């Protein structure tokens, strides 16, 4: 693909960007060359806009290691070692690294992001496909993923966590913003939230679920320890906790919202150490059969109000 002023004008660029492009990029310049020219001139946002307008290519950038101020590449970025970018890395297709991936402002891929180390963004993290890290994932901003999110260690998200697929976290999930997951959510350790958490399918957490505002799952919810929320707890099918199930003051606990009442005994079971206060639907059956004896020293305690 070669660029001309007429070709670019058809995309309705801003006046300042078009003037700069006209003066600094010759007609007939290649697509990636134009992106590189913009990035090298510090016009990273213009390069990202250009990529959004003209889309990805099949080109591959393959290097041993990558360290730069910014990277905007129309194809796939493949790095045998680590990627360290001061501001933005954006790829039209996938980003793959044999080590870790770090960016100071944003990490964006049109398709998958797969790394053998950790993913750290001091801004946002966005992928048009799956995000997979053998170690942990941390973003100071939001995480938006059109596929699945998989991390071997912790996932820490300081903004909204939005997954169209499922979430699979080997250790703890710490979310400071809204969490929305189109499929299931599985966490090996604890799940700590601050705002509401909604999952289209089921939730399985090895430890405790705490801090969340409203908790909602289309299927069942299972936690190895307690489930404590600030708001309501809603499960389409059964609820199971190794400790207590506690909704926020004035809110209810609901199981079996997506099944008929006649099937509650099988499909809307509620298992917890004590009958949840405010249980509005479902059938409480006692302590979880998976945790017949709970060490009270590990019991969840609601944090004191600040």
How should these model regions be labeled?
Residues 1-306:
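Short, glycine-biased loop/turn motifs at secondary-structure junctions and
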């Amino acid at each position: 693909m070669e660029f001309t002023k007429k070709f670019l004008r058809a995309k309705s660029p801003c006046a300042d960007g078009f003037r700069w492009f006209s003066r600094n990029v010759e007609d007939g310049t290649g697509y990636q060359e134009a992106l590189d020219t913009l990035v090298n001139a510090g016009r990273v946002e213009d390069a990202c806009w250009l990529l959004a307008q003209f889309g990805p290519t099949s080109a591959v950038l393959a290097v041993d290691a990558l360290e730069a101020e910014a990277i905007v590449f129309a194809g796939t970025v493949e790095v045998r070692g680590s990627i360290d970018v001061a501001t933005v890395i954006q790829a039209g297709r996938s980003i793959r690294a044999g080590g870790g991936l770090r960016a100071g402002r944003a990490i964006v891929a049109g398709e998958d992001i797969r790394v053998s180390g950790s993913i750290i963004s001091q801004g946002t993290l966005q992928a048009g496909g799956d995000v997979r890290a053998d170690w942990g994932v941390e973003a100071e901003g939001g995480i938006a993923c059109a596929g699945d999110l998989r991390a071997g260690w912790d996932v820490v998200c300081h903004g909204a966590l939005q997954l169209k697929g499922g979430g699979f976290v080997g250790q703890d999930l710490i979310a400071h913003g809204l969490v929305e997951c189109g499929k299931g959510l599985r966490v090996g350790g604890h799940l700590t939230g601050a705002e509401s958490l909604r999952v289209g399918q089921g939730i399985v957490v090895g430890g405790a679920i705490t801090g969340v505002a409203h908790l909602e799952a289309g299927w069942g919810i299972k936690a190895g320890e307690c489930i404590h929320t600030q708001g309501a707890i809603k499960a389409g099918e059964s609820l199971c906790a190794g400790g207590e199930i506690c909704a926020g003051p004035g809110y209810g606990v609901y199981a079996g919202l997506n099944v008929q009442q006649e099937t509650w005994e099988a499909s809307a079971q509620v298992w917890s150490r004590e009958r949840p206060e405010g249980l509005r639907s479902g059938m409480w059956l006692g302590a979880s059969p998976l945790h017949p004896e709970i060490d009270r020293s590990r019991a969840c305690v609601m944090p004191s109000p600040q």
